[in-house]
C-alpha cells in the first residue's frame, strides 16, 4: 500500500526573514519617512502585528509584507488577514495570524472531497495532517492533483510519500 500525508506547515524562519525584509523595505520607503510604522513577528503566538498611523498606510504595509512573503516562498493564503483594523490612540493595528496545521473542519472537507471523487484511496485524519493510502501510485497522484486544484483557502503540502 502506497501512502502520503497532506499537511499545512510554515517554516517560521522564512516568515521571520520575510518580516525582516519587509522592515528593511519600510525603512527605505519615502512615504513612510517620519511615520511610526512597524511590522513585528510574535513566533510564540504565531502572529504578525502590523502598526501604523493611518488605515491607508496599514494596507500599504500589508502589501509590502505579502510581497516579501511571496519572495520567500510563503503563499499569501497562509496569512489570515483580518478585514477590520483596531484603532488605539493615533495608531491603527492589524494582527495577522499564521495558518499552520489543518483544522478539523478543513480536514473533514478534504476527506469529503477525496471520497466524493471516487478515486480508490482511503483518507484518515491524523491530528494536523491527513494520511492518504491507496494501492496504486496513479491513484495517489490523481488525489494530489485533485487537492491542488481545489480552492481551499490554505496552502497544503504533500510529504512522507511511501511506495
From Swiss-Prot:
Pfam families: DUF520. GO terms for cellular component: cytosol. It comes from the Bacteria. PANTHER family: UPF0234 PROTEIN YAJQ. The lineage of its organism: Bacteria, Pseudomonadati, Pseudomonadota, Gammaproteobacteria, Pasteurellales. Keywords: Nucleotide-binding. SUPFAM superfamilies: YajQ-like (SSF89963). This is Nucleotide-binding protein HAPS_2236. It comes from Glaesserella parasuis serovar 5 (strain SH0165) (Haemophilus parasuis). Belongs to the YajQ family. One of its GO terms (molecular function) is nucleotide binding. Nucleotide-binding protein.
Amino acid at each position: 500500500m502506497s501512502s502520503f500525508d497532506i499537511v499545512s506547515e510554515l517554516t517560521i524562519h522564512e516568515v521571520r526573514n520575510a518580516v525582516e525584509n519587509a522592515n528593511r523595505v519600510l525603512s527605505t520607503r519615502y512615504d513612510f519617512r517620519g511615520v511610526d510604522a512597524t511590522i513585528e513577528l510574535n513566533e510564540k503566538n504565531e502572529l504578525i502585528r502590523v502598526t501604523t498611523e493611518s488605515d491607508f498606510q496599514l494596507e500599504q504595509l500589508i502589501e509590502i509584507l505579502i510581497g516579501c512573503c511571496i519572495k520567500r516562498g510563503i503563499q499569501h493564503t497562509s496569512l489570515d488577514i483580518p478585514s477590520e483594523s483596531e484603532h488605539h490612540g493615533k495608531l491603527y493595528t492589524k494582527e495577522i495570524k499564521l495558518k499552520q496545521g489543518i483544522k478539523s473542519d478543513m480536514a473533514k472537507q478534504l476527506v469529503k472531497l477525496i471520497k466524493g471523487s471516487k478515486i480508490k484511496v482511503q483518507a484518515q485524519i491524523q491530528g494536523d495532517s491527513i494520511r492518504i493510502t491507496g494501492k496504486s501510485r496513479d491513484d495517489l497522484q490523481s488525489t494530489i492533483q485533485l487537492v491542488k486544484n481545489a480552492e481551499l483557502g490554505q496552502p497544503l503540502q504533500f510529504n512522507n510519500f511511501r511506495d
